[in-house]
Amino acid sequence: MYGTIAAKPHAGPVNAASSSASANNSPQENRYDPSALEQRWRARWKDQGLDTTETESSKPGFFALSMFPYPSGSLHMGHVRNYVITDVIARVQRMRGDSVLHPMGWDAFGLPAENAAIERNIDPGEWTDRNIDQMRNQLDRLGLSIDWDREQATCHSDYYRWTQWLFLELLEGGLAYRKNATVNWDPVDQTVLANEQVDADGRSWRSGALVEQRQLNQWFLRITDYAEALLNDLDKLKGWPERVRTMQANWIGRSEGAEITFQVTGSSQQSITVFTTRPDTLSGASYVVLAPEHQLVDGLTTEEHLASVDQFRKQVARLSTIERTSDERPKQGVATGACVTNPLTGEQLPVWIADYVLADYGTGAVMGVPAHDQRDIQFAKANALPIRQVIDAEGAKEAIDAGKAWTEAGTLINSGVFDGQPSNQGKGSITSHGETAGWATSKVTYRLRDWLISRQRYWGCPIPVIHCPTCGVVPVPRDDLPVELPRGIDLSGKGGSPLSQQSDWVNVSCPCCGGAAKRETDTMDTFMCSSWYFLRFADPHNTDQPFSKEAVRRWLPVKQYVGGIEHAILHLLYSRFFTKALRDRGLIDIDEPFERLLTQGMVQAITYRNPITGKYIATADVSDPNDPLDPTTGDKLEVLFEKMSKSKYNGVDPAAVIDRYGADTARMFILFKAPPEKDLEWDDADVEGQFRFLQRLWRLVENASSTLTDLNSTGCPADLTDQEADVRRALHLAIDAVSDDLNGEIQLNTAISELMKLSNTITSSGPDRLRPPILQEALSGLIRLLAPFAPHIAEEFWSRLGGDGSVHQQSWPSVDPSALIQDTISIVIQVKGKVRGSIQAPADADKATLESMALSSDVANKWLEGATPKRVIVVPGKLVNLVP
């Protein structure tokens, strides 16, 4: 249920203006009616093909893109903010002379559609297409300048044909492979989850179920082959937020260290290799830990430890990766009975298995150095293992004795010949010693894991391979693509992949030997489809290949990408990997997909929550917002601003806002309320304020229309009045400021503030007191500056005042430096550092002149009371400070 909007009624339209204004200014209803006006102009833009991309243009190309949405069927305010920001940028770049590509598509595969289909007993394709139609209509009402001719939906076979084609490219390039692996299994959705899809509590990001661990044969992509490039090339992304680059760098997780080999006691053939970033602490190792799944565990475990090891491994199998590595959870393990030799000291160390060591991270084995690793000291204390300090520094011993590992630098002790070395130097010294002796190797590792793309569900892109008992894994011939999903099947939502139950679809002939074979029944992670969609937008109607190199050269990289911070790791990292992999396959020339990235903040609204029960209360049920109480219990309610959500009763339906105020008001509010990257707090009063601003502009243009017949300025008169000079100066200051706000760091809220200041200056000057050339220039500039933000009303203004063509096809206004020159300026007068007034002075006045004018001013007479100041501080062009 959506929340309410506009607690107070506005002085909105009553009678609709039924016809378009024309160049000859035919009489019209004098009231701003956004409903009729906006619908009329959108229809005209569509008829004129105003938003169609210029493919053969010699103009520079500019690709503006919003992260495409999942078609839930319901547009929310987060969508509105995302798409309106991108639309403003696209419209400005068109007016600046670029050929702009501004497309839209649908990230349409995935579990929500399949689950909805199960709940409603409807085909997910039918449900998805219906939602797409509904959301397209909702987006259209916002007045977005989208080229709908390039629309793509990832669930349509003419799109996922090419997702399959690209998968085969990766398979041929050795970047796609299968392996048995421990995977995160969602017992509710019955599918495998990537690590990134499991939250910090070990729950599925979608169903909320506690995730289990299972061994399955899965498809992976070798994103780790690109770990170094993905990390290093973050430095190229100067147009990305530092926060996103840091998040990706941390996720990739580069670590420098050494692999050290520990020989198994009593065996000349068996050894355990560990990776450590702290070879300087090797003398302090008191045990070695293996992952419970490590291949050596069975062979190393002694007979008396078999039962406890087996029981512990079963216990760990029920834990998710997130749970096992959580800092909050106690570390648990059992001994195997085996020992290894510390290669540096010769000491015998016991071998344990523990839940915090993962088989697929590093070597699946770690050395335990309790004195210098917090996780290790907790484990050692819990299991009575030795704690040996090997780095000395002020406060180190005391910290270790108190149970806190010393992880800072210091001086090596208890390390034999390395005693006395700085610990940072000891890292290299001990590694070099080990390399010479043959038990150590310098190594760089990454936290990044290969990308698991297998999903055991129906509504996804089929993986285009066939399993033949004779030939093995056989790619589907490219001429046979797409491998289409069977439609109209029964979806129980349980028991692994629904595709495996479709015998007519599964059973096929092997393309190599002709024998009986079976299709792959896993589908791809939906991020496969969204990791290359921006490339398809460059060449959407190509039936021979997913995109041509020429089209990609024309449009890519995306000049401005807009989307939520929640995609910092998943979508953005995968897209960067795809781009580099396809470059190496010779399909494209670019290294990075997105030149500039803007991560817009969330749209929040007020919530009322009972802190005792945790229950949210609908706004309509709160009788007194100033003293909010739970209507059932009488408890005092918490008042918060939180992300809009139906479950919190604080959602605002965009359609309701547009119905009441019009799309231009909705756009202006969403852009003005907060800087794009900050969270936005919904406020009905501020929506009303933007509507009133557009009404004031309406009245300004109405008044001017009786004076002007067109917007073709005949040039600026030489003999400007002070009032006219002020208007010209305000105009060109606004052009300069708004243009600056749309370059570099996009600041749309301050740009709108400049429009308000300019309109106030024109209005207060009185259009009837300005000569036509000045009024023409001022309104032409104002309307063109307004056009990207409020496109419908700006088009109406342009038409009413006799502008040629569409305002959206006009040039972006440029600054006339001569208009900014001032004969006189305002100089602040301070007395003892406090502002007491101001004077008007010649713009080129020197210090002596300004001092004289200040001393003889009424301000000085009032505050100095005839006394002579001891000191006068003059800052030319700004202020005079009188110090009595």
From Swiss-Prot:
Where is the segment annotated Disordered?
1-37
Q: Where in the cell is it found?
A: Cytoplasm
* One term under GO cellular component: cytosol
SUPFAM superfamilies per the UniProt record, alphabetical: Anticodon-binding domain of a subclass of class I aminoacyl-tRNA synthetases (SSF47323), Nucleotidylyl transferase (SSF52374), ValRS/IleRS/LeuRS editing domain (SSF50677)
Q: Name one GO molecular function term.
A: aminoacyl-tRNA deacylase activity
Q: Where does ATP bind?
A: K646
- Residue ranges, compositional bias (Low complexity): 15-26
What catalytic reaction does the record list? Answer: tRNA(Leu) + L-leucine + ATP = L-leucyl-tRNA(Leu) + AMP + diphosphate
> This protein's superkingdom?
Bacteria
Q: Where is this motif: 'KMSKS' region?
A: 643-647
Instruction: Give the Enzyme Commission number.
Output: 6.1.1.4
Q: What are the GO BP annotations of this UniProt entry?
A: leucyl-tRNA aminoacylation
Chain span(s) of sequence motif 'HIGH' region: 69-79
Sorted keywords for this record are: Aminoacyl-tRNA synthetase, ATP-binding, Cytoplasm, Ligase, Nucleotide-binding, Protein biosynthesis
Pfam families (UniProt xref): Anticodon_1 (PF08264), tRNA-synt_1 (PF00133), tRNA-synt_1_2 (PF13603), tRNA-synt_1g (PF09334)
* HAMAP family for the chain: Leu_tRNA_synth_B
Listed NCBIfam families? leuS_bact
Query: Member of which family?
Result: Belongs to the class-I aminoacyl-tRNA synthetase family.
* Protein name (record): Leucine--tRNA ligase
Q: Which organism is it from?
A: Synechococcus sp. (strain CC9902)
